[in-house]
UniProtKB/Swiss-Prot annotation:
Homodimer. Part of the PDH complex, consisting of multiple copies of pyruvate dehydrogenase (E1), dihydrolipoamide acetyltransferase (E2) and lipoamide dehydrogenase (E3). It comes from Cupriavidus necator (strain ATCC 17699 / DSM 428 / KCTC 22496 / NCIMB 10442 / H16 / Stanier 337). This is Pyruvate dehydrogenase E1 component. The keyword Oxidoreductase applies. Residues 1-20 are annotated as: Disordered. Component of the pyruvate dehydrogenase (PDH) complex, that catalyzes the overall conversion of pyruvate to acetyl-CoA and CO(2). Its cofactor is thiamine diphosphate. Keywords: Oxidoreductase, Pyruvate, Thiamine pyrophosphate. The keyword Oxidoreductase applies. GO terms for molecular function: pyruvate dehydrogenase (acetyl-transferring) activity. Its EC number is 1.2.4.1. The gene is pdhA. Pfam families: PDH_E1_M, Transketolase_C_1, Transketolase_N. InterPro entries: PDC_E1_N, PDH/Transketolase, PDH_E1, PDH_E1_M, THDP-binding, Transketo_C/PFOR_II, Transketolase-like_C_2, Transketolase_N.
Amino acid sequence: MSAVPEQILGASSANDADPQETHEWLDALQGVLAAEGPARAAFLIDKQIEYARVNGVTQPFHAETQYINTIPVEQQARIPGDQDIEHRIRSYTRWNAMAMVLRANKHTNVGGHISSFASAATLYDVGYNHFWRAPSEAGGGDLVFVQGHSAPGVYSRAFLLGRLTQDQLDNFRQEVDGKGISSYPHPWLMPDFWQFPTVSMGLGPIMAIYQARFMKYLDSRGLAKAGDRKVWAFLGDGETDEPESLGAIGMAGREKLDNLVFVINCNLQRLDGPVRGNGKIIQELESEFRGAGWNVIKVVWGSKWDSLLARDTKGLLMKRMMECVDGEYQTMKAKDGAYVREHFFNTPELKAMVADWSDDDIWRLNRGGHDPHKIYAAYKAASEHKGQPTLILAKTIKGYGMGDAGQAMNVAHQQKKMPVDAIRKFRDQFNLPVADDQLEEVPYITFPEGSKELEYMRQARQNLGGYLPARRQKAEALPVPQLSAFDALLKATGEGREVSTTMAFVRILNTLLKDKQIGKHVVPIVPDESRTFGMEGLFRQVGIWNQEGQKYVPEDHDQLMFYKESQTGQVLQEGINEAGAMCDWIAAATSYSTHGVQMIPFYIYYSMFGIQRIGDLCWAAADMRSRGFLLGGTAGRTTLNGEGLQHEDGHSHVFHAAIPNCISYDPTFQYELAVVMQDGLRRMYAEQEDVYYYLTVMNENYEHPEMPAGVEQDIVKGMYQFRKGVENSNAPRVQLLGSGTIFREVIAAADLLKKDWGVESDLWGCPSFTELAREGHDVERFNLLHPTETPRESHVAKSLKSARGPVIASTDYVRAFAEQIRPFVPRRYVVLGTDGFGRSDTREKLRHFFEVDRYWVTLAALKALADEGAIGRDKVAEAIKKYNLDPNKPNPMSV
């Protein structure tokens, strides 16, 4: 049995009333460690702490450990394989990653990052050679979130394996001509390569957490086996300041996601300077993650420190490691061995430890993140750990190998070019076969066919199931119900029976859940608003998923719709957590690619807390080619009438219109919703189009009419004729457009126009101004590029072609929403909207305040007719008086 280390005995001797007793306790613990191992020792310590607390002993909580490696040398798993070959592969990968950025920026300013992958090369190399499995017959493979700025290194490895060509590398960040590769991981741009977009920073970590949990969801519901699959997420230490990076780590700990591994590349630098110059980011992150219930493995020092630490019998080296702040550590790696000797080994005792070392020996003291032996041991421990997610904190050097051109320098992140001298030093450090006269060119280097290095790389990936990154683009198509399955919603609700479009959605959802072929694929997601949307019936019907089941008797267990949690439940209940719910939705919406099984997610939320709050995740979902339905509930500026400024959504459709593969609709009637959702199911799950849907639904109850005959395709296109005015009438005529609940005000305005002013109206439901605008712009583009062909007509122009009179549109959204179609309206076009701050009041008063109700629509129609000379202007003045409209009323935009 080895003796208790002196640094432990001496650490608190000044406050030790009985050193002999302390020695005996530590000797006893050492005996347990030697005879029964660390697990038994940890158990006994936990029991002692528990007993002490019960008996009133208080002690401060220390979430951080010493600034040394978590895994002792004697417990370090030995890395298999040929490390000389792996080092050469890693060196080639480093060079080509650097060359790619330098070559791309010789004649352009497209940018790119050298320093991030330079610091992380070993972290990725060990994973690709030994751990990360590709999808295969044996299983679904591991999911790897590559930190975005390290993309050049992943391309470099793919190039060495023959997966990418030199032409593609030379067109890094130059994609328009179809030859290039994307700046960061973008599945939209490289759909068979990248799986997960990890830029913007912070999105990768939170998405990885929910991917890991969704893997458990699929497994417990019997839809896809999780087995020992893992989700690996790589992020930078500076990235952890993004709220999304750490915002969900508590959930991961609480849910015991032992299929999740975070690897944080702690190169101590962010874009402008140190991450924590006056502190220690590794210690800070260790505390946060341990406090959240994670298993934390620190990989701080490389093997070249092992002998020094073994000789540190008094703990002076560990003390110095602990007191030295990150700003100092960074500076030391930007200098040289002499500087490190002077400033790190800064006491006589420490200097004596390296007295017989040269400055070069000191300079070669490596960091853990650059040591494949230490990284392998950490990865293996993480892969085998049960009951907790694991965090690996790997200390590295930003710009490793860049020398005077960037190593550990504050400018490292922005370096896109390097002088020849720096390139020469890089070549020499990694012993690469590039001649001096080639350095200016920075050529790519490869392993010849049949070389042991190339065969080694291929065999490593073959052993792990195939190449990564790789992305599956299709899964088995689902049998989508015909529109007739929703026949009840195509009929009128009947006199006196009022429902909301939210209620109609819940009815459609229930129909799908009960469908024998696709019901199990439906994933309802709600952020603590099921009762708001009338969905509490799902609690008992399909249950709320919880991998621990339900360990308590719910308060409402004797009621029909009691709160039921189950290991096989179907509803994902996220609590007040829109970002988490959106990540749930993304995991389900990309399940066809990540797990080979199509899932149909429906995420319903207050529309104001959708894209306005988690817009970057909506863009990431688009990039990932997500398929599913987002539903903005209580949508529109005036529909959520009592909540006030922050809660009233007048712009979500405008935001969603910017996302190219997001298809959005604002339906008024239940038949519109049924038609749109059935068509969406067909497009996404039968045809497997890479689109997703945003639908707004309301909580306002009213009667719904029967669907007019033959309008299904026009509803999908975004505009259909709801009702035609009296034909062959010589009366003045207008075309009235609307969507959502405000279309009902437009219908009422048509009645006022006829009754009070003798004006005929044709009524057009416009469930998607966005789709109308997209189709219109596409038609315009075709006509621009095909001047000698018969011009095409947009759906808007075609619909209004034979109609007469000015066109007036009113919606519950800002004017920009309906303004989208102005270029395609073939006559005078007037748009009403809810521009301005929201406020609380009744719906009637709010609609009057925002000037979108039936009276303002009527006034706008009369004014448009007067402007065209169809009626006198005195009629407009008369209407203002008749409807008690205040000419001096403030513009709602200004108050």
